[in-house]
Amino acid sequence: MIQMQTQLEVADNTGARRVMCIKVLGGSKRRYATVGDIIKVSIKDAAPRGRVKKGDVYNAVVVRTAKGVRRPDGSLIKFDGNAAVLLNNKLEPIGTRIFGPVTRELRTERFMKIVSLAPEVL
């Protein structure tokens, strides 16, 4: 469950290390985001020669949450931390590699690129 001010790891090779959620997109009163939701983020920590720099604002899709994802069969998929992948204005991933596992919930028409780049899909 991601809300405003939540800090997330970045699971791609854009050069960003940590980002902070500044808005959950999808309705004016929407409070929480979970896996597969798009959020607006600000870069808080970035590598020196990366594609992005500190203070930049991007869209991102949540790929892992510590809260977890409940499946229809009753199972729960949890992770050690929260992670996101940075997106451009066309909602395509900026990075060319994804680090760590992603969940099957991302397998929509929108995020198939992220699923195909991920080393493991749970």
Curated annotation (Swiss-Prot):
Keywords: Ribonucleoprotein, Ribosomal protein, RNA-binding, rRNA-binding. Pfam families: Ribosomal_L14 (PF00238). The keyword rRNA processing does not apply. It comes from the Bacteria. One of its GO terms (molecular function) is large ribosomal subunit rRNA binding. SUPFAM superfamilies: Ribosomal protein L14. One of its GO terms (cellular component) is cytosolic large ribosomal subunit. One of its GO terms (biological process) is translation. Binds to 23S rRNA. Forms part of two intersubunit bridges in the 70S ribosome. Part of the 50S ribosomal subunit. Forms a cluster with proteins L3 and L19. In the 70S ribosome, L14 and L19 interact and together make contacts with the 16S rRNA in bridges B5 and B8. HAMAP family: Ribosomal_uL14 (MF_01367). Belongs to the universal ribosomal protein uL14 family. This is Large ribosomal subunit protein uL14. It comes from Laribacter hongkongensis (strain HLHK9).
